């Protein structure tokens, strides 16, 4: 038994000692046959592909222990561009010969236990050739485990370290080892790959979970024979597949297939001869990038003399782009860039030195240099600017382009840094900003490539920030923060947070806009470190003491970090107790909009927001749009993997009309990546105030002293910061800020000063002289708009590239000449141009050519083989015109002259093809369309006959199938007939031509696609497509000499009439109806007034078949329903089970039907008849009146035939009637359009529009009128008609086509948004009614013949000026002042008091117990400007109100006496006879209004102060919101934070709040007669606080009588107290003054005095 166990053990050990790793014995040469193939295209056969094949013998021999030689013998290179698999490979003999020397050199490599180590080769072997050797070595790379047959690992190979699966099977009988390994190239620890142009994109992980755009995998199959020291590879087969599709893979994909075969031939004893070349270490098996990084895949250039070739192309670009842009200009520009990339710095400098003095050449070089894409470009720009060779504008343009096009490496980053901190750059503010932003961008791009980039890269910016803070250079600090935001380095979080209020003390001295920039600078950092930024953003958001704008910006940053569910729920919890309405509205709207997000990367956030919104109250949804809002809209298509998102942030701080900040951002999703394409932010702090208020009031010592004396009496007064007029704007592309501008008063003043300077006037005069002499301008702009590349190795060792290029060249040619009559003197004023006849003749020829390429394939410096999509777009739109302007005579004339048009004014061609070419034989490149021509038209006459016979047998069914779909089932047809039907389906061609006005315009569209293979978007794009647009003179009509458009205004309009209009006084019906209408008049004389429906839109439409009794019942019903419309509206709106019926709401007119606008017109029974009376009295106003304006549009033809249109307008002021007649100029054409409008009253206007032959074919009536719906004011617009033209069938066809592209959920969404109900309304009438249910809400009702649509409670952004629309009397003398007043009135906020109830600006009501004889601040400007102040006191004797207004240089007192309101201005009484009163500036007006008096001063911020015996009200303008204080509040919309005392403290007691705004006295002998003061009071009882007896003092001042006075009337007040131990000492003077800053320990009641009586001894 022991012997058996020993034998088994020895057998097991022996079996484990077998070495499966390949081994090559010493002193032997192993000969293999090697074949490698790389082929790209679509997976279907019969289509074109492009590829490369390499065939060779491979010799492997050992030269030392673990060191081997590998040599290729007789290598051959083949190209492929043809129809697969029919066409053969073509030998690239010249390329093989050129590379033969390199291939003949053997390479060395280390190899042990199946693992390839170092690779050594002479320097004479190029990296591309060495990579081909690495492709062979990659086959030998085998990590074989002795104890496992199935396993996986991350294996190093030519393509990186990727996940590899091994399966080993031993065939002991055949003595063979079968090994299979497979690689997942999408699962790599280190994938060798180079990306260009993708630094600004973000990986959308969630998008890629649904499918990768680029997928790759490889399988390796080995057949090996065991040997003593290892295994011998007998055969190795490699198959690798890369698949790319921008859409979902189910739509189809392009693929690149690599195959390798290594077959053992023999073993030779002759060793490989080692050459004398010096072998150097050239890396490992990992692929090394060569010159393919600089090589564009769209063309292959053989560079022999870079400078000479570049100069040749430069000459071509200049020579062939003097007229319209040459169609190959973009391609030549790309060739020029390619040559500059390959050239040395010395060569580029030599080209510049040769052509820098030639403007035509200079700009081509400067536009091409940034596209070099390396540090060479930045160094060139730096050197030339510092040397003074390029201007500031040229440097700025080149720097912006270079920063975004140059690849970021450490050298480039350091170059941009040195440029940003260069002294010469620092002296130019624009260049400094651009370079600082660019430096941040370069750091960001570098960190994308190197995630562990050092913090030292942003250290210089951090130091600059510290210096800016220390020196209080806020503008510089803002720029530095934007640079840090561009860099997005995590090391910047600490320096940024030091500038924020929560984290650093430096923030206290910083302006709000700088703090806002600091918050926004965190956004790009959040993309790399979302968790760290979330911690900062949450703390900012939670700090309720921060300015609301900072908290809302923190909310933006927080949601961009894609917070988890827990954090979103935390925000919702905070929102429940949020008192700031701006923050609450913004956060809730942000969450609400994100709940509808369909973007994959925001799916988790959308789910979290759904939960959070449900936790919150619906009251947030009802907030006005005056509050801050966030809007997010997106759409994402899973099949196409394309999406777009738009976000808009509206940040306000005081519910004003103009927001404080507006940010709009667009984001796109494509092929598993996302990018913030564009973002624009505008800050309007102070702009509205600067536009609407008067210039700053002069520092009048008396005025300022008076106001400051008043506010000094307030307890612990703190003024608000003055809003400095400032506007700022920034623009971001792909998440990087490229430019920003701050505009303040100093900049505006400088611009105005520059505009009025003598140099500016001289510049204007010189420009005018140049125009008079004739000037020609030419501008050419080439641009490499896009270069996106991804390069990675294949198993063969050749690189595969996916790339996208767009290059364009635009040119504008302008020739302009001006003529002035009479000629101006040498020195003239601009006003003289208004009295001059100006003629301008111009010729323009703009042209653009754009080339776009999408490439997939092999790209090296030696050979290219790829499939390519190429799009060419070219537009040329020449024009020649003349314009004449005679302002003095009211004439404007424009003439367009014919030009020789190009063959096509716009052309677009798209084609896809396979191309193969090599550098040794570039002219012999082989191009094959992806869909071969023979594949499209493959048929024979015999097959056509058979097909015809088969179709004839089943014509009906076949035709039905063809009409239903473009996809045809071929199951019933033989396979040889399928291509014929496919060819019929694939080809599409359409031409549409329109001839009008002597011009023939044609649109041509042709398409041949691969949709016959699979009807998806991807296959529809494959093939050839073209769109052509041409505009040419019509051959069937006489030539057009010119087109004229002329406008004549004023008394000379009649002189321009070409066609005299004559209209019959009796309106006749069109032919065929005249007899019938006359017969009706004879037989039924009462039909007109009885049963015929009125053609006027103002009358109700009633059917002629109704009886009088039914009409009477109808009227009774209408009357009853309208009387109860108010209550029914409320009940129906609130009742969930009762649907709203808009027909129940009847419109009651404001005007009387019998009212007329002219004494000449007799009263009639309806307003419609009054319109007809006016119309019939003078059917054509041209018989009595001269035209007010005439417009001529005509063609001047070679045969002198008049063609065109004439528009004349007549105005009859007596009847308020406007008539416009448009007529064809052709004397044989009686077509006209007649429009008559009459203002029947202040509440109604009616218009009739008729057209056709003599305006009799068709007509419509339009009526707009105001009235009431229930108690609410309303406006109604009605459109009625007798006959309308039919809509052409072609229009309906296009409508159906468009409707097919509308997503199915849209109608349902609109149905929920706008409810509708089917009604049988008037068949010839549309009625639109808007009801103002309140100043801020509307009900909208639309009635059409078949349905009624309505929307209730539509919120408005501003209040409706009901009172102001009827009374614009304050400034009747000036229309500008009227508009200004109305605009201010619309957005003003109101504070009022009726009896003892005060309603604040924020609409919060509270009862006020006013102290007698003491002034209280009702409302005042709380900034340091003190533009106005309104005081109120109650007289001690009569207890009547007395208002004092301090504004500008006047002091206004308003009080009542027995006979009415008394007005005093600066102590002088203004009698009623002297009202209205205006101050000397005219900006303040006092006038009677109703039973009281109103003061108006909107330009000072005070819209109105109204005062009568029983009430008063104050209105402040929109731009003062948030800047007021007093009893009326801040007017910031924050009704939860209404009770703010002068110190800024928020109190809960309305009484304490009201008393805090009392102006106390220091003595009872004070002239104000106020006998009270504010002081902290001691609680009358002792309390136990913290287990100690304590004495307590109020932390809020309480109104008390002065010493020596006794209270006559008191009121209870609940206030906070701060407690101290009983034994503690409190200095009465110092302690009580600081007690107001203490914390509240308890709330208790105290007594406040509101009336006092003093003794005579009181001082």
UniProtKB/Swiss-Prot annotation:
GO terms for molecular function: lipid transporter activity; nutrient reservoir activity; signaling receptor binding. Residues 1-15 form the signal peptide. GO terms for biological process: cellular response to estrogen stimulus; cellular response to heat; response to estradiol; response to insulin; response to polycyclic arene. Disulfide bonds join 1391-1528, 1414-1564. Residues 1090-1163 are annotated as: Disordered. Residues 1090-1111, 1119-1129 have a biased composition (Low complexity). Induction: By steroids (estrogen). Produced by the liver, secreted into the blood and then sequestered by receptor mediated endocytosis into growing oocytes, where it is generally cleaved, giving rise to the respective yolk components lipovitellin-I, phosvitin, lipovitellin-II. Pfam families: Vit_b-sht_shell, Vit_open_b-sht, Vitellogenin_N, VWD. Residues 24-662 form the Vitellogenin domain. The keyword Glycoprotein applies. Residues 1389-1565 form the VWFD domain. Keywords: Disulfide bond, Glycoprotein, Phosphoprotein, Signal, Storage protein. It comes from the Eukaryota. One of its GO terms (cellular component) is extracellular space. InterPro entries: Lipid_transp_b-sht_shell, Lipovitellin_superhlx_dom, Vitellinogen_b-sht_N, Vitellinogen_b-sht_shell, Vitellinogen_b-sht_shell_sf, Vitellinogen_open_b-sht, Vitellinogen_open_b-sht_sub1, Vitellogenin/Apolipophorin. Glycans are attached at residues 1089, 1627. Phosvitin, an egg yolk storage protein, is one of the most highly phosphorylated (10%) proteins in nature. Precursor of the major egg-yolk proteins that are sources of nutrients during early development of oviparous organisms. This is Vitellogenin.
